[in-house]
A protein has these predicted regions:
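Formylglycine-dependent sulfatase
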Residues: 1-245
């Protein structure tokens, strides 16, 4: 790391509730790597998302603006290119901000043409970041990685996240998905991140590492599908009566 220049790893996860983070009170869960990150890093206990779903939430996180100001009010709504964001700001101070994962950003239509394929998907990458392992909407990179690893993809590639023999999410299930844990999308992101960081040497870096999980479908690979028993989970936080809710 260059003198006076910090290395920064920003990990963004999708739909992980704060009250299900062990270091923040969810002692019934086992997440040793996350525990270490919280222990050796900084945990912002009062940091809350300002918007839903994921695209608007990421727009707020990375621009520092409320939804009413950046106006990307739902997935596929374009983000105005005039807004400063974290990637652009980092470039101004000499970083080359890298991104693994995704930001669910639809481009400003004034910067491209109407046939731009990014308008036909749930979003692309936010300006300012350099992709070093994007989880593009078609997921071609991840599926190609699986094939290169020798995993036989089903005819409908997305079925890897379903239990064997199912063609739709079967509701609440403890059956494992078809892809093994070592070939999960989380493993893919982690491998790409480690490869990128090992190649940086002593140069300062900023890496936005965006994981897809625990985003649905809620079908985990073995052995994680059987790690917890439903009976051991805490009851939902409810009001005293349906009328109060």
């Amino acid at each position: 790391m260059a003198a006076g220049r910090r290395n920064v790893l920003l990990i963004v996860v999708d739909q992980w509730r704060a009250d299900f983070v062990p270091r923040l009170g969810a002692g019934f869960l086992r997440t040793p790597n996350l525990d270490r990150l919280c222990r050796e890093g900084v945990a912002f206990r009062n940091h809350v998302t300002t918007a839903v779903p994921c695209g608007p939430a990421r727009a707020s996180l990375l621009t520092g603006l409320y939804l009413m100001n950046h106006r990307a009010v739902q997935n596929t709504v374009p983000l105005d290119t005039r807004h400063m964001n974290l990637g652009k700001a980092l470039r101004l101070i000499g970083y080359d901000p890298a991104l693994i994962g995704y930001t669910t950003t639809t481009p400003d239509p004034r910067t491209t043409g109407p046939r731009d394929p990014r308008f036909t998907s749930l979003g692309d990458l936010m300006d300012g970041f350099r992709s070093v392992g994007a989880f593009e909407p078609t997921m071609d990179g991840y599926f190609g990685w699986l094939a290169q690893k020798g995993f036989r993809l089903p005819e409908r590639r997305e079925d890897i996240w379903l239990p064997e023999g199912e063609d739709a999410v079967p509701g609440a299930t403890d059956r494992p998905c078809r892809v093994p844990a070592e070939l999960s999308d989380s493993a893919y992101f982690t491998e790409r991140a480690l490869a990128y960081l090992k190649g940086k040497g002593g140069k300062p870096w900023f890496l936005h590492l965006g994981y897809y999980r625990p985003h649905p479908p809620f079908v985990a690979p073995a052995p994680y599908n059987a790690m917890y028993r439903p009976a051991d989970m805490p009851a939902p936080v409810r009001r005293a009566s349906p009328a109060e809710e």
